[in-house]
């Protein structure tokens, strides 16, 4: 395919036009008085949102060079979202400011490579200073503040703080759509996995169609059980003790299943069978997790253990087990606390080492089941459009909260960026163009406060000067139109979000400035096929 080429200033300006189109669409959403953007959907109702990355992902421009610029800034938003989960609008805004100031200097004859060196130097110093002013998150109140600022709702803040308090920092919190109008929280205590009973005849409560077993033994195996003789020795020992049994296996079928059901119906003893969770190697690991949590052993031929040789001390135990058609929940497993801690540490190491997002998510789920629990925030609203918007807000708030717990918090509303400007201004260089790069970052750091003020209907430059003249930590509360101590008032941003937004924006923007040529495909013209003979108008009468 033939290519179209642009060089130098023309290439950079065409790409900058695309950057501006995307950034100007996103920037209107920043701050407590930021607006929403409506996104057209081919199927279903339009999506109304103020989430920067969701908006950026929808934007594709017709002009190929403008689209290149837009896609580069889209990467800033996406990367920030992947790393920190929030701050995508801020990152987009910073990238636009760095590109705008940088191109002015490049046009005036400055060397883009030296400018990039200056930008990197300034960003390193800025990140250092952001970490210096960062404060750790202390307790439920701080968590609620971070979530409330991100979601622009105190109610959501309290909900997320409750969820994190109940499942711990290692717990998994998911956001789902609710069928009711309100937004509520549901917490699953203990270990839950998505496998139900193998036969409905095993239920103990026929009204609710669930089996609840108290003070229960748990047999864990990766084998398929079809012959009752294999598990008869251990069943006899359990019957003698008058206890109940949960069997977790690959499957229970044939003679084994019918015998267990028959004994349950006769009232001889209560046994519930469920299939093992997961597949392949993940199944082996999950069975091992259950074994450690309950203090049992996995009966597997790989480990040289046979079902016929199982003794009572090889079984796991728990205070209670609840089995429904779809889920099994083990509450208060009696496993050794030290062994559980070691297993948790092992999974944490695997999470750090893995590069796959899918594997990371699955490991995080396993960690939560062992260390914390699982909380579900169910989001409800009057219409589907409102529901989607609310769900996105809560997901952002959740990500911001986790980022805050990880690295701490800084004064919000762009105040942290203003507070570190004097430290950036102190940086020097003998090379003029490097100094220009430092100045570009110094100016760009003002941009979030300016935009928050503009969205609130006040003059951004005036607000910036007042914040600069105030003590460190004092910023502009756009919601109430006054200057306050941001940390004390609870207007805070996660350190990780503030840091990531600047690093990602500077990374893409500084590379953008070094562009000297742009290459794009020339769209092919569609050839209209010739008309078939006899299809013309001649000869009609």
UniProtKB/Swiss-Prot annotation:
Gene designation per UniProt: groEL
Subunit record text: Forms a cylinder of 14 subunits composed of two heptameric rings stacked back-to-back. Interacts with the co-chaperonin GroES.
Source species taxonomy: Bacteria, Bacillati, Bacillota, Clostridia, Eubacteriales
Predominant location: cytoplasm
GO MF term (any one): ATP-dependent protein folding chaperone
Any one of the GO BP annotations: protein refolding
Catalytic activity: ATP + H2O + a folded polypeptide = ADP + phosphate + an unfolded polypeptide
Native source organism of the sequence: Clostridium botulinum (strain 657 / Type Ba4)
Record key words, sorted: ATP-binding, Chaperone, Cytoplasm, Isomerase, Nucleotide-binding
Name of the protein described by the UniProt record: Chaperonin GroEL
Binding residue positions for ATP: 29-32, 86-90, 413, 477-479, 493
Domain of life: Bacteria
Function comment: Together with its co-chaperonin GroES, plays an essential role in assisting protein folding. The GroEL-GroES system forms a nano-cage that allows encapsulation of the non-native substrate proteins and provides a physical environment optimized to promote and accelerate protein folding.
